[in-house]
Design a protein with these regions (language model features):
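Short, well-ordered beta-strand segments
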Residues: 15-19, 67, 104, 127, ...
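Short helix-loop hinge/linker segments at domain boundaries
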Residues: 1-19, 37-38, 88-93
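Central regulatory/effector-binding core of bacterial HTH transcription factors
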Residues: 13-81, 156
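Hydrophobic residues within well-ordered alpha-helices
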Residues: 59-60, 121, 164-169, 205
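A late-sequence structural motif
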Residues: 28, 107, 112-113, 118, ...
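A structural signal for short loop-to-beta-strand junctions that line the ligand-binding cleft
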Residues: 87-99, 114
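Secondary-structure junction motif
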Residues: 70, 105, 111-118, 122-146
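A ligand-binding cleft/hinge motif common to bilobed small-molecule-binding domains
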Residues: 71-86, 141, 145, 159-189
């Protein structure tokens, strides 16, 4: 990673490689490009899809300059290292914003008129957004603490595609609330609180 002492943003021609999910990119990339054009006009960005909740190995191997996303385990590990003086940490992190996940479905869905009960949620058919392709997510982990499960009939790795699919089907999905306007489908979607407690959706940037 570039040393701050030698870095001149106005002169750099660096290509910065950043990993983030499409929902995060929809919110952050437009203002980031404006800032880059003003402060580092010769630099370029290369975005990679986010495929993991632990970007530290990719950063350590210099495959990325920066990762942006919800990394609770990785950030907790970095905080632990920072507290242990004999374990100097070569990673840095900063919270960008804290968001909220909601249960999203098409306009006119039978479950869209009121908050969804846990029983109705578990009985419904679901679309899972999974960066890594694994067939379960943090919602399923939260349900497991209540000895409950849900039926996932489709797994994919793009929030934009998820919004498009649920707008045309009876599937439910989980989306970041702040992302819904960026889909261009807000008028075709409705959303309700997720009927199981979830951790805060903290979005951090992490670097090496």
């Amino acid at each position: 990673v570039i040393s701050p002492k030698s870095f001149d943003p106005l002169r750099t021609r660096e290509t910065f490689v950043i990993a983030m999910a499409d929902a995060t990119a929809a919110l952050l990339v437009p203002p980031l490009l404006d800032r880059l054009q003003r402060d580092a006009p010769n630099a370029t960005l290369r975005l990679r899809p986010l495929t993991t909740r632990d970007p530290l190995p990719l950063l350590e191997n210099d495959e990325l300059h920066l990762a942006v996303g919800h990394f609770p385990g990785a950030v907790a590990d970095m905080i632990l290292r920072e507290m242990q003086e004999d374990r100097p940490d070569t990673f840095g992190h900063q919270e960008i914003y804290e968001g909220q996940y909601v249960c999203v479905m098409r306009e006119g869905h039978p479950l869209g008129e009121a908050p969804v009960s846990l029983d109705d949620y578990c009985a419904a058919r679901h679309l899972l957004v999974s960066y890594s392709g694994r067939p379960f997510g943090f919602v399923d982990e939260a349900l497991a603490t209540r000895q409950r499960t849900r039926r996932i009939v489709l797994t994919l790795n793009q929030f934009f595609t998820a919004a498009n699919v649920v707008a045309q089907s009876d599937l439910l999905t989980i989306l970041p609330l702040d992302f819904i306007p960026a889909t261009g489908l807000a008028e075709r979607l409705v959303w309700q609180p997720v009927p199981v407690a979830l951790p805060a959706m903290r979005v951090d940037m992490v670097w090496h």
